[in-house]
Structure formats: C-alpha cells, structure tokens
Amino acid sequence: ILIGLVGSEMCIRDRVKAASEFGGTGTDDALAASAPGYGGLIVPKGEGLRITGTFLDEISHDIPHQNWGEKEWDADFRHMKSIGIDTVIGIRSGYRKFITYPSPYLLKKGCYMPSVDLLDLFLRLAGKYGMKFYFGLYDSGEYWDTGDMSHEVEHNKYVIDEVWNMYGRKYESFGGWYLSGEISRATKGAIGTFHALGKQCKEVSGGLPTFISPWIDGKKAVMASGSKLTKEQAVSVEQHEREWDEIFDGIHDVVDACAFQDGHIDYDELDAFFAVNKRLADKYGMQCWTNAESFDRDMPIKFLPIKFDKLRMKLEAAMRAGYDKAITFEFSHFMSPQSAYLQAGHLFDRYKEYFNIR
C-alpha cells in the first residue's frame, strides 16, 4: 500500500510540474485533477434500465418541429441504433387536421395533405436499421375537447384497416400498434375505447402487439399551457392502484403492454408507484414498460432536455422495479446529437458514459 501511495504522490507531483509549465493555476487544481473520478461519474454505472425504444414525435401537441428531411431522419435512426434502440413508435398518425401519411379517409374528412409520407419513411428506416415500428393511432382532438374517449373509435376503425392494407402488409418492420389516447385516471369511455381499438388492431394484423402510455396523476400533472409546475391535488398510490386495477381488468386481453409516463411524480415517489405498476401488470399478464421522459418538467420553460441525473434516477427506479422495457419521449428532440437543442447531445454523451457505450 505504501509503495502505491508513494507512486501516486510522484505522479501527482509530475502533474503539478506539468500544470505550472503550461500555465496551470497551481497545486490545488492539479491535485483535484488527479483525484479518483475527476471529470467522470462518481455513481455506479449501468444500474438503470437501458432505453431500447423511442417515440417519434412528428405530429405534436406542444413540441416544436425540427423540419427534418430523409437525410436528417436517417442520421437520427443511426444515432438511435448506436445506443441500442430497437423500437420506434409513431406518437400519433395525425392530430386534428395534420396527418403523417396521405390517408384517403382522413383527407376526405378535411385533413391537410402532408408534403412527405412520414409513415413510409419511418417504416423504411426502421427496416434499414433492424428496428420494429409501432403505429400510433389517429387523434381527432375530440377526447381532449370533451373528456370522452369513445369518439376516437369511429375515426380509427377506418384508419386501422387503411394503414394495415397500405403499409402493414408491405413492410416487415411494421411491428405493432400504439393506442395513442392518453389517460391518467378512470376516464369516461376509456376501457371500452382501448378494448375496441386493441381488438381491431390485433384482428387485422394477425395478433401484432399493442400498448398504451398513460400518465400518473401526480403533483406535476399540470396543463402544459399553464404557468404552474405543480398542483396540490395528486393521486395517492392506493387510489392509483385501485383505478388501474379496474382498467387493466377490462383491457388486458387486447393490450399487451403499458408504459406509464414517469415525469408527473416526484423522484422520491418513483419506487412506490413503479412497484404498483409492475404488480398490476404481472397480475394481468401484461408487460410493464416505462416511458422515461427525456424532457424536464421541473423547468418553467416547456420543454427542454432533462438533467442527466433525473433521467438516471428514473431508469434506476425502473430497474429496481423489474420493468420489462424502457422507452422514451423522445430521442430526436431531447437526446439526439443533432437536435435543435444543444444540451440534447450532451445528454446523449452522459447516457453513453453511464452505460459504457462506445
């Protein structure tokens, strides 16, 4: 041990000398630079659940567009692949009048013609990079206006058949369905809507998997358009379990996985809610995924890439709970090296450092 200490001291003195010769600020800085973990992580690496899926947020409620073409999307899929992403999910195929593909049905309903067939683009790129693409259903906006989810069944019963015939039969990368309606509590029409849509998706595609991604009605579940970051009335763990026990009971035969959004509860609440989510999923034979939000809900600016430690803590909680898969909302804006947000690329670097990805 003594020899090791002497050797370390000699090494430090050499660094001090080098620092002074090249304009260093002195002994204290050089000693700090030689300390274990300097410039790197001081927490154990790789103890979180790796992100293996991401949403593709091209028809968005509240995230600015990056106006990418095929070249940029191709590069982004390559970045995704480099960290182990094998699943990409179209967040929704349309929102109100904006749509991702030239849908004969939706165009007749007054939707706008898109300049690019993004659905075809995403399916081709998913195939190129060995990924599976999950198709996100159409969102008419009527649920957000009325609070009743049942309106979405009428539109999507045509969209599901149309998309399967136009794309599902053509591309092997078409791997599943995302039932894009978002809820947090027992919601009018939710069980019937999820069941009807999930059943149809499975019937037309020969049983391809389906999933949902609800939010937890925690303290951070506030309107994105408002100025508040938190609210006083938040769901308890017990009430969350009661309501989702009822919902899972009504949908588990046609919904294969549930990826709860993880950003609406505080970091010291993660373990309690995650344990409930996993227990309920196991009870009903569903997969328990986490939707690890890579944007920061704690900031007054909506929305910017998340602080790395916050993402790390959420992924570590998912690992402790025994979750089956981690997906994120979403890579292209908040983790990509080519994002419009400079700090997204830094998050990408910290993520790779934590998981020892070269």
Please place each PLM-identified region on the residue numbering.
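Single conserved hydrophobic/aromatic residue that forms the stacking wall/gate
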Residues: 1-12
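Substrate-binding cleft of secreted/luminal carbohydrate-active enzymes
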Residues: 88, 259-267, 286-358
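An active-site-proximal structural segment forming one wall of the substrate-binding cleft
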Residues: 113-129, 148-175, 200, 240-251, ...
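Boundary/entry segment of secreted carbohydrate-active catalytic domains
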Residues: 35-94, 230, 236
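Active-site groove signature of glycoside hydrolases
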Residues: 138-144, 159-190, 257-261, 327
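Aromatic-lined substrate-binding rim segments of carbohydrate-active enzymes
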Residues: 70-141, 190-211, 270-280
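Active-site clefts of carbohydrate-active enzymes
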Residues: 52-62, 141, 209-229, 262, ...
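Aromatic- and acid-rich polysaccharide-binding/catalytic face
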Residues: 172-185, 214-215, 228-269
